[in-house]
Amino acid sequence: ISAPLEHDAVDWLECGKSATVAPILPANDPILKALALPATMAITNAEAEGTERQLERLEEALAGGLRLVQVRDRGWPPAQRLWFAETVVRLAHERGALVVVNGDADIARRTGADGLHLPAAALAACRERPDFTWVGASCHTAAEIARAGELALDYALVGPVLPTPTHPDNPGIGWTGFAAATAGNMLPVFALGGMRRDMLATAQAHGAHGIALMRGW
């Protein structure tokens, strides 16, 4: 029978910070991680924008409160991508921001990144959760989102929701399609594709945890 717990200690924690109270039941771990997951993810696009300008914008965004970055730029030679990822991790960690590296566990480990982001093909081939603090995946279908949940990943990127220059022939699934694809799923989901910073409330109204942007962050 439940009863009031008088005189128990209460501690107010800042949203986005990890809880320090222990012990905590394991079932609460995904909830606490979701609370610590920022609502806006910036995805790097230095291949198109240029390294210098991209890093300048990143510093500005981090100073303005950005706290989650995905290093993409998969077309670069390994050495160039390693250097860029190291620079992003350094800048982000100076501001207390998280960094995940797209598709390359070796670079993620060597740079001290916080996690790994799996492209959809890597998600399909994955048999167990990679050994990183933060692991997410790109998903395009409800089945892929479900698979990410089965692997106990921390988040999924779902899209494209709206038309985007990255996929000019794809009109996007729209907000209705996004809501349908993510319905009933407990995994934190970011809306991807054609996003702007002022769309966060719209995304959350359709069931998203947040938004992911390659442009406009």
Description of each model-found segment:
Residues 58-64, 90, 94, 109, ...:
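Acidic (Asp/Glu)-rich catalytic clusters
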